[in-house]
């Protein structure tokens, strides 16, 4: 193996090692688990994913606002869970972008149950914790036909 090829291989291996030590699970898997916890109304599981200084931006709907403390975030999810009961989450277009500093996962999610809640989701992870979450109510998602 030539020196440049060896250097590239070592660099790729180092990046993979840095990724595996920074995240207990892949960010897309963490996002899916978070979304499923939201659908199930499992407030403790939802809030366990957040980092110490996390922010939840809820854009639209009755819980519209910025939640910048863990108590405020937990209160918002508790209200949501009580108002909606268990839901089914249809997740589409999940994408992950990552670099050594963190990862962002985006997805279109339609929660269905007592009511239908269409959401454009953006979740940012650093050091394996959810640090920024945007919950954008997106009415056009509810109007889309189901994909099979």
What are these regions (language model features)?
Residues 71-115:
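Surface-exposed, charged secondary-structure patches
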Residues 42-57:
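Short, well-ordered alpha-helical segments enriched in acidic and aromatic residues
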Residues 8-18:
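Bacterial N-terminal signal peptides
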Residues 116-148:
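Short beta-strand edge/turn micro-motifs at domain boundaries
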Residues 19-24:
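Sec/Tat signal peptide C-region and signal peptidase I cleavage site
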Residues 55-68, 81:
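A short gly/proline-enriched turn/hairpin at secondary-structure junctions
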């Amino acid at each position: 193996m030539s020196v440049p090829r060896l250097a590239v291989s070592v660099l790729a291996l180092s990046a993979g090692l840095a990724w595996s030590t920074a995240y207990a699970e892949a960010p897309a898997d963490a996002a899916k688990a978070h979304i499923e916890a939201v659908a199930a109304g499992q407030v403790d599981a939802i809030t366990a994913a957040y980092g110490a200084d996390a922010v939840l931006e809820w854009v639209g709907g009755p819980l519209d606002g910025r939640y910048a403390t863990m108590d405020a975030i937990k209160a918002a999810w508790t209200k949501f869970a009580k108002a909606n009961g268990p839901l089914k989450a249809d997740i589409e277009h999940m994408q992950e972008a990552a670099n050594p500093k963190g990862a962002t996962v985006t997805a279109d999610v339609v929660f269905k149950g007592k009511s239908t809640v269409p959401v454009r989701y953006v979740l940012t992870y650093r050091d394996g914790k959810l640090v920024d979450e945007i919950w954008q109510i997106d009415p056009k998602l509810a109007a889309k036909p189901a994909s099979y």
